[in-house]
């Protein structure tokens, strides 16, 4: 059973998302990815966020667990704080940068205004709806299954 860890990162009323063009299918998703066999979800979260954005997580709280049929069975969604930084950028050593270079898939980080988030073609609508509620009313104190 595969797992993924993803980050909700909000700064200055903007949410950090990854815009993907994967084999012609365009959508938005949260930063993050696969949990390796030798790590837990929090370790994967820290690693994936660093690889994909260059940002260092200083705090993370699990807020959602989502069943996701392909390619992961479960996604663990964390509300994250990050260390002070310059702008987020895909790191040259990441899988996303490699795929961008060989022009197989395109991955692009974007800071999206909270109010514009609902208009994005997000990968999973039920998670998008949960995030919208969290952005507007506050995220749950304990993890909720979506």
Language model region names:
Residues 29-30:
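A short gly/proline-enriched turn/hairpin at secondary-structure junctions
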Residues 120-146:
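Charged phosphate-binding loop/patch that engages nucleotide di/tri-phosphates or the phosphate backbone
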Residues 9-10, 17, 80, 111:
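Conserved hydrophobic "DFG−1" position in protein kinase catalytic cores
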Residues 35-58, 68-123, 145-146:
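Unchanged
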Residues 63-64:
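Local beta-strand/beta-hairpin segments that build beta-sheet-rich folds
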Residues 23-25, 126-127:
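Short, surface-exposed beta-strand-loop junctions and turns on beta-sheet-rich folds
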Residues 1-15:
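Conserved N-terminal beta-strand and adjoining loop/helix that marks the start
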Residues 12, 22-24, 71:
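Short strand-connecting beta-turns/loops that link adjacent beta-strands
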């Amino acid at each position: 059973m595969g797992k993924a860890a993803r980050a909700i990162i909000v700064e200055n009323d903007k949410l950090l998302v990854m815009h993907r063009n994967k084999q012609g299918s365009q959508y938005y998703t949260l930063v993050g990815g696969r949990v390796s066999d030798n790590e837990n979800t929090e370790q994967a979260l820290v690693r994936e966020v660093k690889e994909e954005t260059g940002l260092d997580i200083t705090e993370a709280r699990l807020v959602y667990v989502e069943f996701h049929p392909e390619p992961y069975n479960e996604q663990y969604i964390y509300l994250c704080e990050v260390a002070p930084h310059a702008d987020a950028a895909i790191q040259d050593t990441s899988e996303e940068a490699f795929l961008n270079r060989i022009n197989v898939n395109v991955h692009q980080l974007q800071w999206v205004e909270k109010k514009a988030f609902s208009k994005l073609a997000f990968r999973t609508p039920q998670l998008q709806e949960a995030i919208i509620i969290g952005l507007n009313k506050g995220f749950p104190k304990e993890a909720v299954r979506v």
